[in-house]
Amino acid sequence: VTSNVPDFRDPKVFWNEDTQLWNLILAAGQQMSIYSSKNLKDWTFESHFGEGYGNHDGVWECPDLIKMGNKWVLLCNINPGGPYGGSATQYFVGHFDGHKFTCESAPTVTKWLDYGKDQYATVTFNNAPNGRIVAIPWMSNWQYGNHVPTLQFRSANGLPRELGLFSYQGESYISVK
């Protein structure tokens, strides 16, 4: 999969049990692009998500798309544009049919996975024991990530977190343990 779109990067590939296809989600400028494949070699573009949804104050990157119960969650890391400046992870809850992600919230709603400054580039692990969804972030922020007092070290991973979903006043949110 190639493109001339700026910031076309960070592919996440996963097996979609519902459609019996591989899906790939990647950042493409200010949106996410979704592809499907039967064989991991030949990819078909399916759709984009993001225009008009959430925060667009920075570059969208490091996407993830996870099934949680009967809903899907799209993680979108953004830099800058976090609630306290610099990097952060926003997320969208909705439905995914293997071809298109549809957000259940209004386009103006922005949901943050974490409000701390040192949580970015969150990724999840597939097939964790007992069906758990485990995520791990990069424990840093691009506001100062290049200004650490070492030459090679650029911070560390954050603590693994188990993700879940809960509902409050008609909206779905991620819970973190």
Spans of features found by a protein language model:
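Carbohydrate-active catalytic/glycan-binding domains of CAZyme proteins
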Residues: 1-177
